[in-house]
């Protein structure tokens, strides 16, 4: 199955994900709205939330909470991008000025924090301690991955094992969490959740 077919299959759910993202970004603080909209409208394929949607379909989930899972997965990813661009001193992402280049480092870090905490508010609204546990652990692993990358940034002797640990921590763990949370929603066994 190609990406075009997957986009067709998930279009309705992904429209809901995008609407949820915009709704949940809303704040009384104007800078949060401006920077938040700037970063979420900057392109990207939304593959992580799409994994949550596809996993929910694969296990026969019939509810709508997978849309919330998918949106909060994208929020976690977005917050990591905001922080990562500050740490890496990046000024371009996807052919556009990074949020830190456009709004400053402090604003990017603080709005990243807002997006992280909003994701956790969304998790608690789902009422699943198991989802909260999975996502808390995943975010912790992501943070560890960021620190590992920082420690190895100028190390030409980094081992393949350490490099793969950074990749797993910064990227793969959130993909896993997206699929696992959809399995939890569907009432899968622990083995099925991770399978």
Regions found by a protein language model. Give the residues of each.
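N-terminal amphipathic/basic leader segments beginning at the initiator methionine
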Residues: 1-22
């Amino acid at each position: 199955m190609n990406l075009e077919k997957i986009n067709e299959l998930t279009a309705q759910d992904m429209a809901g994900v995008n609407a949820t993202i915009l709704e949940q970004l809303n704040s009384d603080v104007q800078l949060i709205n401006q920077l938040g909209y700037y970063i979420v409208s900057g392109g990207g394929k939304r593959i992580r939330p799409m994994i949550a949607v596809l996993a929910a379909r694969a296990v026969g989930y019939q509810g709508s909470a997978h849309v919330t899972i998918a949106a909060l997965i994208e929020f976690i990813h977005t917050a990591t991008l905001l922080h990562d661009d500050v740490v890496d001193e990046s000024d371009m992402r996807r052919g556009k000025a990074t949020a830190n280049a456009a709004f400053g480092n402090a604003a990017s870090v603080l709005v990243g924090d807002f997006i992280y905490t909003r994701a956790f508010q969304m998790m608690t609204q789902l009422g699943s301690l198991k989802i909260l546990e999975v996502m808390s652990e995943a975010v912790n692993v992501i943070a560890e991955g960021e620190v590992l990358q920082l420690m190895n940034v100028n190390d030409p002797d980094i081992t393949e094992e350490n490099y793969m640990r950074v990749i797993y921590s910064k990227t793969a763990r959130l993909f896993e969490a997206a699929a696992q949370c959809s399995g939890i929603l569907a009432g899968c066994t622990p083995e099925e959740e991770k399978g």
